[in-house]
């Protein structure tokens, strides 16, 4: 599943062709993705202008010039394909096959500039909806979300309060979207390794100074990943078709049995399964 840096990269790729553009044609080729499309989906969007394309957690938000916001979630395998009028393809993809299969093309947007943006989703775990902009923050998808990890609201004081008295490990809590929005398995593993904090240590026993280091590590990892265009594992390319390359900077993720890259550490990266997810860490320097 794409994490915050990948979704932000997709947003950056789609923004130039969607922001300030009027949608002259919208086609819903099936009535549902993970959830049914809302009534009037095509009619409301046709003729609307996407004023701004934003991201909240792992959601893309198309702010319309009407009362609604177009909410899009990529799920496990959703991706966008951008086709310019001259036929040039600039795909922004989360994909499981090298070439799009037309049967997986579920939603098509066409702008007044003649650009066609097609949403493909083989697994159909992604979804789209229209939510009233005035009450967006109260919607169940957003009401319980914590602060954005790159915002000023996500700081050591916030995380210390979230960790206080908790017996769970910090990884479990950082993946809780109510504590911080948008973090996923890859970047939590990476940040904990940089901060040299064990993913299994009871969070309530982590000191304030170490939490300050962890917050800084989270922000650094995310900024670097966004600058690198995300991580290309098996299913991701940027909105211009180029591959993200942050995976080449991984210190822990998917590096089981390899040397830890932290300075002065001679440990070997291990892997444990927590709640069905692989946790990569160094048992030597992460305490």
Curated annotation (Swiss-Prot):
Catalytic reaction(s) noted: Hydrolysis of DNA containing ring-opened 7-methylguanine residues, releasing 2,6-diamino-4-hydroxy-5-(N-methyl)formamidopyrimidine; 2'-deoxyribonucleotide-(2'-deoxyribose 5'-phosphate)-2'-deoxyribonucleotide-DNA = a 3'-end 2'-deoxyribonucleotide-(2,3-dehydro-2,3-deoxyribose 5'-phosphate)-DNA + a 5'-end 5'-phospho-2'-deoxyribonucleoside-DNA + H(+)
Cofactors required: Zn(2+)
GO terms of molecular function: 8-oxo-7,8-dihydroguanine DNA N-glycosylase activity; class I DNA-(apurinic or apyrimidinic site) endonuclease activity; damaged DNA binding; zinc ion binding
One Pfam match: Fapy_DNA_glyco
Membrane spanning residue stretches: none
UniProt keyword annotations, A-Z: DNA damage, DNA repair, DNA-binding, Glycosidase, Hydrolase, Lyase, Metal-binding, Multifunctional enzyme, Zinc, Zinc-finger
Family designation: Belongs to the FPG family.
Name of the featured protein: Formamidopyrimidine-DNA glycosylase
Organism: Phenylobacterium zucineum (strain HLK1)
Gene name tied to this protein: mutM
